[in-house]
Amino acid sequence: CYQRAYEMESTWDWAKLGGFLDTLNNHFAEVENVLDIDRTLWMMAFENLTVCLDGPINSIPHNFYLFKDNNGRFSPLLWDMNMAFGTFTNGLPTPVLIADLQELDIFHNSTDASNKLTTQVFSSDRYKRMYVAHMRTILNEQFANNNYSARASALQQLIDTDANADPNTFYSYTEFTSNINSSVGS
């Protein structure tokens, strides 16, 4: 039954996925045995701060991977970050204003019963405190001092030639060069 809701990118070991989901849903006190909870909290904090709603914190929890780490636990892997900074707003009331994105609740979707990962994680006061601490760290080490902006500019310069030559882009080259400091697209 999992094959309708999940895509397996490696071996077809549905039993391990089923065990993980059973623990998440029915034995949450044991979740740290099957999930790298700290890495999950970092991912959720990063997605909230960058308003990347095309992942587990949205009401449509998809577009992220889980892989088995060296400790035998599932660990999240970000994917589809091109939807960050509010470019994917499904699940938010319409119309979505810039202020809505800037003031997104730090516990966005924490009570949405259809999103088990988020509701389960945020049901723990300890995990909530860790999550807020991770948000604070990201804010202090990347946003408050503009490290993220400098890094974005460096990455933009690194891929500039390839982006200009790419015939399959979603946006024009002019939009590519201006999108660090302005909204691009709808």
Where are these regions (language model features)?
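Internal "kinase-insert"/substrate-recognition segments embedded within catalytic cores
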Residues: 1-50
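C-terminal catalytic region of ATP-dependent kinase domains
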Residues: 5-11, 67-186
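Sec/Tat-exported extracytoplasmic proteins
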Residues: 21-28, 48, 52-53, 135, ...
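Mixed-charge, polar/low-complexity N-terminal
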Residues: 30-32, 36-37, 47, 55-56, ...
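Active-site acidic catalytic loop and adjacent metal/ATP-binding pocket
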Residues: 33-87
